[in-house]
From Swiss-Prot:
GO terms for cellular component: cytosol. The keyword Aminoacyl-tRNA synthetase applies. This is Cysteine--tRNA ligase. Its cofactor is Zn(2+). HAMAP family: Cys_tRNA_synth. GO terms for molecular function: ATP binding; cysteine-tRNA ligase activity; zinc ion binding. Its EC number is 6.1.1.16. ATP binds at residue 268. CDD domains: CysRS_core.
Length: 458
């Protein structure tokens, strides 16, 4: 299996640090507001990567943090007259509900920055002791000029970084690119006791401390959006490797493309958000997955109603195939399940090519539909179809059924009655049965092998 490593800028063979195990850390949200579909894009992609690694037999330990203290959280909380922790926890709850609605596998741990302050202080103290960091005015900064290979992830030199650097008023840095590990307290902000006085953690050190606590000094995969490569992930490498002395901090860096609305990135700062809640009120979770997975995780994706409507139609086709009832009277037809599985695996082994893997599922679905139309069935094909869809996180569950399994015998009886009426050329009565079942949310499909029924989606 080959994956693209941002650090090397090329495809590399995936070999975990420990045989059979994968330690995976994905940067989580800053819960200043409701999650948007840009978040959905990122976490759907990493959910599929995690699911596929599990399918390949790896035991995956997956950590995803919450940056629950931040300048923007503080500003929004102050504007609403509430505590920053209240705002953060409210939005974390909304986020977790959204992830469940999207069928995203929960992380093994969701550490919060505010709960990891002792570990953060330990790391900052260690970096000062080793000469990599210094205190100034109650804040602590990392000396980037002392960091060997600083810029290796973003492939930039310090001179290139300096072009856009500036020192904020009140900062007392030795060098403009030095970044804050600990921020001195300001009036009206949450703060914690530290050896340097009251303050709060810097953004970058939070993830280093949490990954160190839950995954150790080295991890296999670190994921996040491409907008995090610099400065966030670059700075994570610097402080983690300087603190532990172990290199590399991360073996494989994976970054997903960003979601655009027109020509602009979808983001809170631009105010052009579509929340996950809004999207799910119009489209199914399966449709959102198909929309995201129809492109490489590394590519940018443009949000459009047309693309999501097309994805919904595709999801509906897959749901109808998955909902097919087993009919023992139909002839078993062979499907080359080995070839379909090999195709799927070959594509996913090539840097998680979900677009081609998804196309394989649609191809298998079309073959199953053709077999059914010709009066046959393929039990193995149907099982593989559901298995591969599950690896991509597609639930393919008919939404809000208007019937239950208890009604199945009654529906079967009506289908037999309709068959007898048609044989007796009582077409009007036969059609009335079809119409009545349709109104109740039951779709009838006639084929050479007989009539089958399916539950319609909403």
């Amino acid at each position: 299996m080959k994956i693209y490593n941002t650090l090397s800028g090329k495809l590399e063979e995936f070999v975990p640090l420990e045989d059979g195990k994968v330690k995976m850390y994905v940067c989580g949200i800053t819960p200043q507001s409701e999650p948007h579909i840009g978040h959905a894009m990122s976490y759907i992609n990493f959910d599929v990567i995690r699911r596929y690694l599990s399918y390949k037999g790896y035991r995956v330990k997956y950590i995803q943090n919450f940056t629950d203290i931040d300048d923007k959280i503080i500003a929004k909380a102050n504007a609403q007259g509430i505590e920053p922790s209240t705002l953060a926890e409210r939005n974390i709850g909304v986020f977790l509900d959204a992830m469940a609605a999207l069928n995203i596998t929960p992380a093994d741990y969701y550490p919060r920055a505010t709960q990891e302050v002792p570990k953060i202080i330990e790391m900052v103290s260690g970096l000062i002791e080793k000469g990599y960091a210094y205190e100034a005015g109650g804040s602590v900064y990392l000396r980037v000029q002392k960091v060997e290979g600083y810029g290796k992830l973003s492939h930039r030199t310090l001179e290139q970084m300096m072009a856009g650097a500036r020192i904020e008023p009140g900062e007392e840095k030795e060098y403009p690119m030095d970044f804050a590990l600990w921020k001195a307290t300001k009036p009206g902000e949450p703060s914690w006791e530290s050896p340097w006085g009251l303050g709060r953690p810097g953004w970058h050190i939070e993830c280093s401390a949490m990954s160190l606590r839950y995954l150790g000094e080295q991890i296999d995969i670190h994921g996040g959006g491409q907008d995090l490569i610099f400065p966030h992930h670059e700075n994570e490498i610097a402080q983690s490797e300087c603190f532990s002395g172990v290199k590399p901090f991360v073996k494989y860096w994976l970054h997903n493309g960003l979601l655009k609305l027109g020509e602009e990135k979808m983001s809170k700062s631009l105010g052009n958000l579509v929340t996950i809640k809004e999207a799910l009120s119009r489209y199914s979770a399966d449709a959102l997955r198909i929309f995201v997975l129809s492109s490489s995780y590394r590519n940018p994706l443009t949000y459009s109603e047309e693309a999501l409507e097309a994805a919904e139609k595709g999801a509906e086709r897959l749901r109808q195939t998955a909902a097919r009832q087993d009919n023992p009277r139909l002839q078993e037809i062979n499907v080359d399940v080995k070839t379909y599985r090999e195709r799927f695996t070959q594509y996913m082994d090539n840097d998680f090519n979900t677009s081609a893997a998804l196309a394989t599922i649609f191809d298998l679905g079309r073959e199953l539909n053709r077999i059914e139309a010709e009066g046959g069935k393929s039990t193995q094909g149907q099982e593989l179809f559901k298995e591969l869809a599950g690896i991509l996180g597609l639930s393919l569950i008919i939404a809000e059924p208007t019937t239950s399994a208890d009604a199945a015998p009654f529906i079967d009886m009506l289908i037999e009655l309709r068959k007898d009426l048609r044989l007796a050329k009582q077409y009007q009565l036969a059609d009335k049965i079809r119409t009545s079942l349709d109104a109740a949310g039951i779709l009838l499909e006639d084929s050479a092998g007989g009539t089958i029924w399916k539950i319609k989606t909403k």
